Each structure stands twice: as C-alpha cells, then as structure tokens.
Amino acid sequence: MVAVYPGSFDPITLGHVDIIKRALSIFDELVVLITENPRKRCLFSLEERRKLVESALKNVDRVRIDVHRGLLVNYLKEHGIKVLVRGLRAVTDYEYELQMALANKKLYGELETVFLTASEEFSFVSSSLVKEVAMYGGDVTEWVTPEVARALYEKLKEGKR
C-alpha cells in the first residue's frame, strides 16, 4: 500500500525523517509530498526544499519525492492514493490535524489519515523552531542533517546582505 506524507518541509527536520522511516514500517511505499501552504511564508523555494528532502532521504528506500501546488486531495485522487500520514507532536497539533483530516475525508470519502506521534527526542522539533534558532546563530545540527544545516545557515546569511 502507498501512503502520502505531505508537508512544506521548510526545512525538513530529523523529526520528519523519523516519521518517514516509521511510516515505512507500515506502508510499502511513501510519497513525501512537498506542498505550498498559503498560510506559511517559506524560507526555501519549492525546488530548494525538494533538493533538501532528497539529500535528507538519500539512504531511505521505498520513498518517492514529489511536489504539488494546489489542493492535496486532488493529488491523492489523481494518483489513486487513499492514505495520508501525519505526524503529531502535541495536543495542539492533534486539534489542527483532526480538523484537516475531517475536511479531507469530506472532500475525498475514501481517504484515511494515519497519525504517528513524534518520537520523544523530536517531540519539540519543528521547522519553525529550527529556522528561529539558526537565525540567532544557534546550533541546529541535532535537529537537521548536515546538508540542511549548511543550506539553512547560507540562506539566512544571504538574507542579511
């Protein structure tokens, strides 16, 4: 069975990688779908995020990386995928993700959403936190791959010019 793990991945964190690897213990294949979220202002372009996701997952089998602009359920329908994977860090994540799961189910009745809780070591890690810590010169190397950390520091340095 194929499932989709969507997100903005701006940037991808080791928490995301952990969810991906754990989802692969359940599903035959996982599509990591990099999406645009109009409510988020991304630091990295869609193509930059794709490259960072590819580098973070280079040693992970049974993963397909794709990009989508538009309504998520349209992508799922077009590709005949009926399972969505979402990661949960806290109760606040659950409230939002439950609303999204119910809305997606209403739009695509065959869709099931599977929630995976974050591993304890990543339960506080978010892309927003990583960007904020890096912006102030903090060390993010325990939360992202070396390639992502490098790209993040370079991007933030460019922004200060």
Curated annotation (Swiss-Prot):
Amino-acid positions noted as binding ATP in the UniProt annotation, renumbered to this chain: 8-9, 16, 87-89, 97, 122-128
Origin organism lineage: Bacteria, Thermotogati, Thermotogota, Thermotogae, Thermotogales
Originating species: Thermotoga neapolitana (strain ATCC 49049 / DSM 4359 / NBRC 107923 / NS-E)
Alphabetical keyword list: ATP-binding, Coenzyme A biosynthesis, Cytoplasm, Magnesium, Nucleotide-binding, Nucleotidyltransferase, Transferase
Name recorded for this polypeptide: Phosphopantetheine adenylyltransferase
Gene: coaD
Single GO cellular component term: cytoplasm
Top-tier EC class: transferase
Binding site for substrate: 8, 40, 72, 86
Reactions mediated catalytically: (R)-4'-phosphopantetheine + ATP + H(+) = 3'-dephospho-CoA + diphosphate
Keyword Magnesium attached: yes
Taxonomic superkingdom: Bacteria
Transmembrane segments: none
Subunit field text: Homohexamer.
Keyword Disulfide bond: no
SUPFAM superfamilies for the chain: Nucleotidylyl transferase
Subcellular compartments: Cytoplasm
Pathway assigned in UniProt: Cofactor biosynthesis; coenzyme A biosynthesis; CoA from (R)-pantothenate: step 4/5
Functional summary from the UniProt entry: Reversibly transfers an adenylyl group from ATP to 4'-phosphopantetheine, yielding dephospho-CoA (dPCoA) and pyrophosphate.
